[in-house]
Amino acid sequence: MVRRDRLRRMREWWVQVGLLAVPLLAAYLHIPPPQLSPALHSWKTSGKFFTYKGLRIFYQDSVGVVGSPEIVVLLHGFPTSSYDWYKIWEGLTLRFHRVIALDFLGFGFSDKPRPHQYSIFEQASIVESLLRHLGLQNRRINLLSHDYGDIVAQELLYRYKQNRSGRLTIKSLCLSNGGIFPETHRPLLLQKLLKDGGVLSPILTRLMNFFVFSRGLTPVFGPYTRPTESELWDMWAVIRNNDGNLVIDSLLQYINQRKKFRRRWVGALASVSIPIHFIYGPLDPINPYPEFLELYRKTLPRSTVSILDDHISHYPQLEDPMGFLNAYMGFINSF
């Protein structure tokens, strides 16, 4: 009798816990995205949108030095946005006539449709569409990319190599800390869980918060160059914009695409004759030294490489903007 009464009280306790947890969970899942900081708000309001197949794509387009014909297009990484380039933006405008960056579909201030089959091919088509929108489809373009953007650049390079009409005419390509080789790429644990989580992935994306995000991202920065709390909040605010946290698992399918299309994308890098450069933060745990660099130099012996200081990691343009900019300008001025 005593045991039965104890079981009854335990069941009642769990019911009460459940009744309390349901509204708390509902409130948690409907927490609004954080407000944009003044700097991030300024970045958004100074940008523009264009429409690609009914979807709004955010971009920045600055006119820089007068009299120069040079154009540079910046392709950002995962899971952030074009705001990754803000520390070197002014420096680029002193060298280029046009400095252009976009938020890929599913990133930043661009639309984040769901469900949607996000692909590198679509992102490359969006870049081409943006340049047509700006009337630059027949101009020679310098590409500067990072991480996820490196893969998009590889697809653009493949299309350029095919010499098809309507494709970009690429003058040069500079990559940085991207997993262009599947065999040397080391994704984070959270990325693995979201990419291959199946029915669990949508639950994980809904439960993701600033604490989980910041603890996951901070280790890919060097020990002396980690982002401040406010910088992390800026990154998180951009991800949460348009419920971007809910499409992260879909965006991560690019890792599988990279394996499937390795021959196409690595082959494009190895076979073109344009100047190619790589800026490398050697402390990168995602593309580790020396395995990555050895394979890169073996596969692309004609490419030049800039290795930044030993403590610079996966986000070199944020961790060492001056070193990154100097390395890029050295490359651009070499041909």
Swiss-Prot record:
TM helices/strands, residue ranges: 13-33, 63-83, 266-286
Motif range (RVIALD): 98-103
Organism: Mus musculus
Record InterPro entries: AB_hydrolase_1, AB_hydrolase_fold, AB_hydrolase_sf, Epox_hydrolase-like
Keywords of this entry: Endoplasmic reticulum, Glycoprotein, Hydrolase, Membrane, Transmembrane, Transmembrane helix
Family: Belongs to the AB hydrolase superfamily.
Chief localisation class: endoplasmic reticulum
Protein name in UniProt: Mesoderm-specific transcript protein
Tissue: Expressed in mesodermal tissues. Isoform 1 is exclusively expressed from the paternal allele in all fetal tissues and cell lines examined, whereas isoform 2 is preferentially expressed from the paternal allele in a tissue-type-specific manner.
Single Gene Ontology MF annotation: hydrolase activity
Organism ancestry: Eukaryota, Metazoa, Chordata, Craniata, Vertebrata
Membrane-topology descriptor: Multi-pass membrane protein
Record-annotated AB hydrolase-1 domain positions: 71-310
A GO biological process held by the record: regulation of lipid storage
GO cellular component: endoplasmic reticulum; endoplasmic reticulum membrane
Glycosylation positions in this chain: N163
